[in-house]
Design a protein with these regions (language model features):
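Conserved AMP-binding/adenylate-forming core of the ANL superfamily
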Residues: 4, 26-78, 95-100, 153-156
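Conserved pre-ATP/AMP-binding loop-to-beta segment of ANL
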Residues: 24, 135, 149, 159-180, ...
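Conserved AMP-binding A3 loop
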Residues: 37-40, 176-204
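Conserved ATP-binding/catalytic segment of the ANL
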Residues: 55, 66, 357-359, 378-379, ...
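Conserved beta-loop-beta connector loops within the AMP-binding
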Residues: 365-387, 423-424, 486-490, 533
Length: 546
């Protein structure tokens, strides 16, 4: 029987429309330079949609952007998908060769480029096969000098357009955004999300982080500062529902720790999300204690939230909570949420839950399986492969059907991560499959070791890799960066880990061997999305072992 009535499409316009109904006079602020009301922002979004039409862009085509976290990026997050185009959020930290691949693979017809990235784009322009127009973006007045062809400045483009625009009715299954994985092996893979997937993810995040006590407790009218780059999986979808909630936006542009600390204090920011390296940079900043950061709540992803980092944040009045996911899951899908029986625990014990990979978001499922896809016991020790499913997991690697098939098995998405479930239903990620250490046939959790080492007072950061061993196949090796002015010996770190083993927090046989299992370095290398680059560490070890 045919359904009767209007089939309401779940598109991003829902968030935009409701924000305009609820809080048309709320403020979107960009650094110390500009601010707009929601109404002014909405009119600029309509101008940008008209601009796409004036540039000859057709619905279904891809439009790319290289930009910091600015008001322009927020405008594009609405205008480009709602025009019916595929919004390619270009990762500005990729290598030139990766950028060439991604822009050509996406077939971007228009490329929006911040002035800071002009030298990079100019150097590769002759290898970009599909770009017809470049839109240049700058914070300053005056003309921009460039060798790029067919250019127009962003504000001039908007000035030429009318605010009179009716967003077309598009299918909720229309492709809305495209972002590329980090590509640590081979070319990056393009991950596509539809309007429906983005809407359902944003609603779930809004509910999970907003409705439950002792979490992030995101509410309407709060102050929001994104500290995850907006090119990274739509800044976790938070900019969408923050508009619906009528939140005040503080957009930081290019990240500068001293300025971010000042804005957090002056604007009384309520909530943010970021990778652990950003929070580490802020809470260990020499001036961190000069600012009142009490009441700021932060969700962390990209790498394990260590106890050291969570406790340092708590000392400054900052509540932290981990989240787990990947590009293909949009990204967040589990979070270190407290349950009612945890509400009255002392903060030290609450932190033990905040730093876990967590329980699934509303509408999400996760389990741990063995090699034959049998679910493993939720006993806190049975380690296996983490598989997930949600209404918003990607169903497409862009133009790569075979890799898409590999991503899904038995209707579950294979994350490529290793972990376990505890008796309370909390997921703990112990490793990426490619980073996992199997010593004598048993798993060693590098993330747990890294967390333990980081709690040594002199340690700034630690990373653990597997190294060849003739007897056990692999053994762990810890790379350790110390805090400025601090000293420590390998024996000190080993004794510290022995105390953890004696307390039952790690297995004794996990402890790296002396002397080869401890390497002190000036800093731990990170890739362009802020994750520890273990390929570099493996190369460093191989060079040292020669």
């Amino acid at each position: 029987m045919d359904r009767i009535g209007y089939q309401y499409p779940l598109t991003l316009k829902m968030f935009l429309d409701y924000g305009m109904i609820y809080a048309p006079n709320q403020i979107i602020k960009y650094r110390d330079q500009l601010q707009f009301t929601y109404t002014e922002h909405y009119n600029r979004v309509k101008r940008l949609s008209n601009a796409l039409k004036s540039l000859g862009v057709r619905p279904g085509q891809a439009v790319g952007m290289l930009e910091w976290d600015t008001h322009r990026y927020l405008e594009a997050h609405w205008a480009i998908p709602l025009y019916g185009c595929l919004f390619h959020t270009v990762n500005v930290r990729m290598t030139p060769q990766q950028l060439i691949y991604c822009i050509n693979h996406a077939e971007d017809v228009v490329l929006f480029v911040n002035e800071d990235f002009l030298p990079l784009v100019e150097s590769i322009q002759h290898e970009l096969k599909t770009v017809k127009t470049y839109v240049l973006m700058t914070d300053r007045q005056g003309e921009i000098s460039t060798t790029l062809p067919n250019v127009i400045e962003y504000e001039e483009l908007l000035r030429q357009q009318s605010e009179d625009y009716e967003f077309p009715e598009i299918s909720e299954d229309s492709k809305a955004t495209l972002c590329y994985t980090s590509g640590t092996t081979g070319n990056p893979k393009g991950v596509v999300f539809t309007h429906r997937e983005l809407v359902l993810h944003a609603i779930s995040v809004c509910m999970t982080w907003g409705l439950y006590p002792w979490g992030l407790e995101i509410k309407a009218n709060q102050v929001y500062m994104p500290l995850t780059p907006m090119f990274h999986v739509q800044a976790w979808g938070v900019p969408y529902f923050a508009f619906m909630l009528g939140c005040k936006y503080i957009l930081p542009g290019r990240y500068e720790p001293d300025k971010i600390l000042r804005w957090l204090n002056e604007e009384k920011v309520n909530f943010s999300h970021c990778v652990t390296t950003i929070l580490h940079m802020l809470v260990f900043h020499p001036d961190a204690e000069k600012y009142d950061l009490r009441g700021w709540k932060v969700c962390l992803g990209g790498a394990k939230l260590t106890r050291q980092l969570a406790e340092r944040a708590w000392q400054l009045g900052i509540r932290t909570q981990s989240a787990y996911g990947m590009t293909e899951t949009c990204p967040a899908m589990t979070t270190g949420q407290l349950k009612p029986e945890h509400f009255d625990l002392p903060m030290e014990e609450k932190i033990s839950y905040y730093i876990k990979s967590g329980i699934p978001f509303v509408f999400s499922q996760a389990k741990v399986v063995d090699e034959d896809f049998n679910e493993l016991p939720r006993d806190g020790k049975s380690v296996g492969h983490v598989v997930v499913r949600t209404p918003w997991c990607t169903h497409e690697y862009f133009k790569e059907p075979e890799k898409t098939k590999e991503l899904w098995k038995n209707d579950w998405l294979n994350t490529g991560d290793i972990g376990y479930m505890d008796k309370e239903g909390y997921l703990m990620i112990t490793d990426r499959s490619k980073d996992a250490i199997k010593s004598g046939g048993e798993w060693i959790s590098t993330l747990t070791l890294e967390d333990a080492i980081s709690q040594f007072p002199a340690v700034l950061e630690a990373a653990v890799i597997g190294i060849p061993d003739p007897r056990w196949d692999e053994r762990p090796c810890a790379f350790i960066a110390l805090k400025p002015g601090q000293t420590a010996l390998a024996e000190d770190i080993r004794d510290h880990l022995l105390r953890f083993a004696n307390e039952g927090k790690i297995e004794k046989w996990w402890i790296p061997d002396l002397p080869q299992g401890y390497i002190f370095v000036d800093s731990i290398p990170h890739n362009y999305i802020g994750k520890v680059d273990k390929n570099v560490l493996r190369a460093m070890y191989a060079e040292k072992a020669k």
